[in-house]
């Protein structure tokens, strides 16, 4: 069985081409909550008998799966990219790309350099950006209520993790320091403009998080932060949703129960 936790306001993100097996269930945190609240709910559930956490960034298999984008790009290009661009919520994908790069160095056939990890967040929800710009390994204080408001005001809500694996050993901070990386902050307007430009040029729509990454690449080019002849990998983490949904019946998962953000273990157990 699979139990998913998600903020109630983001249930529209769970869409499918056909109904799922009833072994898949969803519970949600009430409207106004954010992904951290949903993650916290999931953590409480995993304290109950019979439930095990997927593991997030600490799940090696998950990181290795995410690393296939770097593996695919590098083997196709024939060399390690000079820059790796991605929008981040937890930063797990960027960590995975860095780890894949280190394996390529051991392999030796694709170059002896590290791709600079260039990541981005969606303003006003930019806690990792703020920490990086302050040259701080530790995340800066972020009021919970303000964080929830900020998280619900961005177009790329999947990027709104309040407790990402940024500070831990081997986390995003280390990946960026090791590669001379950089952090970008992108407004909703910049993301929407970049998404439209991508669709015009490439012929396919992209998801908001991918649009944030695209906007960060535009920023880097405009600010001369990448060379004109650089080999750049832009990780488009999702796209084609608009095209896929055309003339199709789409099914949405509905929560079996919605919990308050301060629900305790006994409430959830019931």
Where do the PLM segments sit?
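Catalytic phosphate/nucleotide-handling subdomain of diverse soluble enzymes
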Residues: 214-270
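Small/polar-residue-rich loop-to-helix segments that shape phosphate-bearing ligand pockets
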Residues: 2-80, 148-173
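Active-site/ligand-binding loops adjacent to catalytic centers
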Residues: 17, 35-50, 103-114, 118-205, ...
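Glycine-rich ThDP/TPP pyrophosphate-binding loop and its adjacent helix/strand module
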Residues: 62-99, 106-108
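Glycine-rich beta-alpha junction loops
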Residues: 58-60, 88-92, 119-126, 159, ...
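Substrate-binding/catalytic subdomain of NAD(P)-dependent oxidoreductase enzymes
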Residues: 86-89, 115, 176, 192-196, ...
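Short glycine/serine/threonine-rich phosphate/pyrophosphate-binding segments
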Residues: 1, 11-15, 63, 90-98, ...
């Amino acid at each position: 069985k699979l139990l998913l936790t998600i903020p109630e306001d983001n249930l529209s993100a769970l869409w499918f081409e056909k109904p799922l097996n009833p072994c898949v269930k969803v519970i949600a945190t009430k409207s106004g909550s954010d992904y951290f609240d949903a993650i916290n709910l999931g953590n409480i559930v995993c304290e109950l008998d019979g439930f095990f956490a997927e593991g997030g960034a600490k799940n090696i298999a998950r990181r290795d799966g995410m690393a296939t984008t770097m593996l695919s790009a590098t083997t196709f290009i024939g060399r390690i990219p000079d820059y790796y661009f991605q929008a981040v919520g937890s930063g797990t994908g960027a960590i995975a790309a860095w780890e894949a790069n280190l394996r390529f160095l051991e392999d030796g056939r694709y170059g002896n350099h590290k791709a600079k990890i260039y990541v981005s967040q969606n303003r006003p929800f930019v806690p990792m950006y703020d920490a990086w710009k302050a040259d701080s390994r530790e995340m800066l204080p972020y009021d919970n209520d303000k964080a929830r408001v900020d998280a619900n005001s961005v177009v790329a809500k999947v990027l709104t993790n309040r407790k990402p694996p940024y500070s831990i050993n081997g986390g995003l901070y280390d990946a960026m320091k090791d590669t001379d990386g950089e952090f970008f902050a992108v407004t909703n307007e910049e993301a929407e403009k970049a998404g439209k430009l991508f669709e015009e040029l490439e012929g396919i729509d992209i998801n908001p998080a991918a649009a944030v990454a695209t906007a960060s690449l535009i920023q880097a080019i405009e600010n001369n932060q990448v060379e004109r002849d650089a080999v750049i990998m832009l990780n488009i983490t999702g796209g084609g949703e608009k095209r896929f949904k055309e003339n199709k019946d789409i099914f949405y998962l509905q929560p079996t129960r919605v919990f308050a953000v301060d629900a305790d273990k006994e409430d959830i157990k019931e």
